Amino acid sequence: MKGSDATLLSFQLLDVSYEMRGSTPVIILWGRGADGSRVVVFYGEFRPYFYVLPDGSVGLDQLAAMIRRLSRPSSPILSVERVRRRFIGREVEALKVTTLVPASVREYREAVRRLGGVRDVLEADIPFALRFIIDFNLYPMRWYVAEVREVAVPHGYSVDRAYTLSGDIREDETRIQEDPLKGLRVMAFDIEVYSKMRTPDPKKDPVIMIGLQQAGGEIEILEAEDRSDKKVIAGFVERVKSIDPDVIVGYNQNRFDWPYLVERARVLGVKLAVGRRSVEPQPGLYGHYSVSGRLNVDLLDFAEELHEVKVKTLEEVADYLGVVKIGERVTLEWWQIGEYWDDPSKREILRKYLRDDVRSTMGLAEKFLPFGAELSQVSGLPLDQVMAASVGFRLEWRLIREAAKLGELVPNRVERSEGRYAGAIVLRPKPGVHEDIAVLDFASMYPNIMVKYNVGPDTLVRPGEEYGEEEVYTAPEVGHKFRKSPPGFFKKILERFLSWRRQIRSEMKKHPPDSPEYKLLDERQKAIKLLANASYGYMGWPHARWYCRECAEAVTAWGRSIIRTAIRKAGELGLEVIYGDTDSLFVKNDPEKVERLIRFVEEELGFDIKVDKVYRRVFFTEAKKRYVGLTVDGKIDVVGFEAVRGDWSELAKETQFKVAEIVLKTGSVDEAVDYVRNIIEKLRRGQVDMRKLVIWKTLTRPPSMYEARQPHVTAALLMERAGIKVEPGAKIGYVVTKGSGPLYTRAKPYFMASKEEVDVEYYVDKQVVPAALRILQYFGVTEKRLKGGGRQSTLLDFMRRGK
């Protein structure tokens, strides 16, 4: 303990930032105390630094002197010291350069790079605040005990107490198993903006309503007077301050709500100081908006990883997850907001729509945040950034932390073109319907391959290096070699991940599945699994700091070899293999033979394998990665069929799924045909909801830059002409209208078309029938029969024909 006024503070770390006090950077740790108070801890002794890797052409002392001469009064170079580190597995001597102002690091980096004798400048692109928590081994969402001195809360800060860090800070081991979200204040919000048939402009279009809700509280609506929204935005600022949330959740607020509110507030002269410091939200890492002292979490970032949901609207995602069903809520299109605001008889519907949006947002937060909190703890990225970052970046921040512990210098990110290499083995399936099929899953195959064969950029044998065959592992097919010892960077990290996950799964067995303890541990093991499984793909990712194409090639080669060996053994056991895909095998469910195969894989090959699921019935086409299956618990899996993937309407997707369900559950092809005929009849009678006819496709570049004429581009151009802003990455929804011209000439934005304009026969001929036939054609069903005529058949007929 340092000094008589020092005290111990137990607090949960929520976020980290820094501010400049004069020319001195001060780290800010935002958290909550064990007594529920909101606290801030300052530390002004940490300084930014980077490493210089010499090329050997100049003496290290001479190079250090050259670097010192670059020092500038605005941010002096405080020290240049010689250090020993490792870089891609090799011992190196480097220079650690420390300066004063974080923003000057990039400038010094460029100046140092121009000096003779410099091979590279490393770790100059790591943000200062993240650098601090990496070096001090602090993880967001975890609890810590720190030696602190209490100080007065500085002007402009909205916290209960403030401290300066005066001594050690260590993890509070008594709270490791505590739910990180317990006791946190969560607030959901959504805004409605006035506009009619064009992109809203914050310079002139008002924010007419803001809905917000504190977890467990009532939904509140702040409403403009006519179109005067100054009081609405000012009222929102005051409500955020009074609720004082630790976590603010929204849906797409990083891309729309925050930028709009920030700009609109400036226009109106309102200070949007919604954080715990008197500053407005600022754009931060990975496109998220930083709200000082609060975690601003965009739930759309979580939804982006729900590959089963094609169109990621709030309504669709909330419906899919059972939070708020579409049929139980008000649904409006963005372009209807102005109309419903202007009509007093419709304004209550608009209020209900906003309430439903806020309710859906809070419901999604309850679903998503537990995983996000655990992923934040595992990766080391704050909760508001962790899902905004791609999985590669999430893993990389954990790797950077591990590198710091191991004395490894972090490589720079280098721009590379997308490389290609042979992927996993995929067997051609045995087409037809198969009953009682077990799916065997190789648990974490690729991370385990990396551990077993010590795969990594630091263990890769480079051209010109000589090692005996007994000293290396040689990958089949590709021939890449990896040193058996010492353990590589990735092996050390993955061993920790895999061991950590095994311990958690063992601990889970001590708790009932519906208990809070089990659920917390389950989210934690999922977060660890996500990062561990990302490691192989990461090495082949062009943006990776630890990029290694040979490593990625070797891992997939070993994966193919393991699958082939398992298939050969299955053949020897008389176990029929129906299909194989990446890290799984589909086999006839003969329990005794399946058990013998599992034993062989575990004991002879050294890999974990388990029965992942059993299909009561599964149907394969002749194509790879394309099947539909009915599990023993009644769930339908549809994999690889066009309506699940490409430019298909929701109606086509629904039809295909229902056809699969009928065929697999009832065995009656005729019942499936009748279902399709009924859909066609409803279409022609105008009884299908127009929203189910919308086809969605993403713009990859500005509409005017497309050379080929495509339907979604035509729709985007029509939107632009109507004053609606469209940018690359936007999902364009269109319907096909009547007419005789090419398809692209008949595409129209769905909100600009009437139901009467829709070309029903296009949807019959090019959507519903093809989607259904992708399955039914294998049972002898033709397009003609779907549209009328033909005999009854059953699944049994097809199975007999296949014998």
Curated annotation (Swiss-Prot):
GO terms for molecular function: DNA binding; DNA-directed DNA polymerase activity; nucleotide binding. It comes from Aeropyrum pernix (strain ATCC 700893 / DSM 11879 / JCM 9820 / NBRC 100138 / K1). SUPFAM superfamilies: DNA/RNA polymerases (SSF56672), Ribonuclease H-like (SSF53098). The keyword Transcription does not apply. One of its GO terms (biological process) is DNA-templated DNA replication. Its EC number is 2.7.7.7. Belongs to the DNA polymerase type-B family. It catalyses: DNA(n) + a 2'-deoxyribonucleoside 5'-triphosphate = DNA(n+1) + diphosphate. PROSITE patterns: DNA_POLYMERASE_B. Keywords: DNA replication, DNA-binding, DNA-directed DNA polymerase, Nucleotidyltransferase, Transferase. This is DNA polymerase 2. Pfam families: DNA_pol_B, DNA_pol_B_exo1.
